[in-house]
Structure formats: C-alpha cells, structure tokens
C-alpha cells in the first residue's frame, strides 16, 4: 500500500474491491467517471433528443447549475449551433454567459421552462423538469437511460465500464469523440 501511494498511483478500477477504507487512508480512491461524463454533456443531450425522435434544430435544451462552470460553458458552446433553443438557469455567472453566447453565436437565449425536450443538471439544487433530464453531479450520475459505448471495445457491466472509460480518457487513450451514446 505504501509503495502504491509513494509512486503516485491515485486511481483504482474494481468497483467491488473490499478494502477501500484501508486504501483511502493511503490516499487512494475509486475512479470517478464524472469528469468524462460532464465533458460529454452536449453529445449526451443530443443523443437524448435523437432517442426521443426530436430534431435538435427544432428542440429546446436547458442547462441548469449554480454557477457558469467550465463543463456547463462547454456544453452551451457546443449546443448553441446545434439546437433551436438553449435555455439557461445559472445563478452565478448566468447573465455573463448569456451575453458571451449572444456575442459568439448571435443567439437569444430563452428562459428555462418545464417543457424543454432535454435538460442537463450540473448541480443537485437545479430543477429536474423536462422530458429527459441528465443529472451530472454527485457520486452517481443519472444518464436518463443513455448507454455509453465505444466502437471496438467490448462493453462491460455499467458500474465497471464508466470508470474504465474515465481512465482511458484521462490518460489520453480515448477521445470524447470516440464515445457513442444511445
């Protein structure tokens, strides 16, 4: 254990590993797939729209969070040219983000509303309304029934699959664009 921590290993994959408490005292933790999932918020929202039979260019997507953080801003930038309406519900930095998106993409953002076809929550306090809602926070992200796959890689059990993809992504062996959401 000591040597593992000394040599810089900070991630372990097995979900059902029985000694997490002992390893946590040595500074080790299970793999958290949330950074990868949050970086893929826009492609996942588009996949939700496709699954519902919605044309993204005729659909509304809401982004909800307590602040205009990096992943929320990235999702907004990626979705602006791809959806009819982008709705923001962001307490801190939301107005600034709206002005930025208007300058960059010439879009007038809509107020958030319960009838959006897809919504992405970046914070547990954000509203859950919408036809399909991704919740990308906390220890268990809710992907609204989406499955994550990589062409050419045999899919494992969901609990073990996402941490594996996170490790491949963090080490540069997998790009966000390699992922498929269905």
Show the residue positions of the predicted features.
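Short loop/helix-cap segments at secondary-structure boundaries that form the rim of catalytic
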Residues: 19-27, 96-101, 126-131, 141-144
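Glycine-rich phosphate/diphosphate-binding loop of Rossmann-like nucleotide-binding domains
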Residues: 54-115
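Short, well-ordered secondary-structure micro-motifs within conserved domains or adaptor modules
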Residues: 111-142
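Adenosine-phosphate binding glycine-rich loop
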Residues: 132-182
């Amino acid at each position: 254990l000591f040597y593992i921590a000394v040599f810089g290993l900070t991630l372990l994959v097995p979900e059902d590993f029985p000694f997490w408490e002992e390893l946590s005292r040595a500074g080790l933790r299970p793999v958290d797939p949330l950074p990868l999932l949050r970086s893929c918020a826009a492609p996942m929202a588009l996949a939700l729209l496709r699954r519902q039979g919605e044309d993204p260019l005729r659909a509304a997507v809401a982004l909800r969070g307590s602040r205009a953080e990096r992943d929320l801003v990235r999702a907004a930038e990626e979705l602006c040219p791809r959806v009819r309406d982008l709705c923001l519900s962001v307490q801190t930095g939301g107005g600034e983000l709206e002005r930025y998106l208007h300058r960059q993409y010439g879009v007038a953002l809509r107020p958030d509303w319960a009838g959006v076809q897809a919504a992405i929550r970046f914070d547990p306090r954000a509203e859950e309304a919408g036809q399909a809602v991704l919740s990308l926070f906390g220890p268990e992200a809710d992907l609204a029934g989406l499955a994550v796959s990589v062409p050419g890689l045999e899919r494992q059990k969901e609990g073990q699959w996402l941490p594996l993809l996170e490790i491949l992504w963090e080490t540069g062996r997998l790009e966000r664009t390699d992922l498929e959401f269905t």
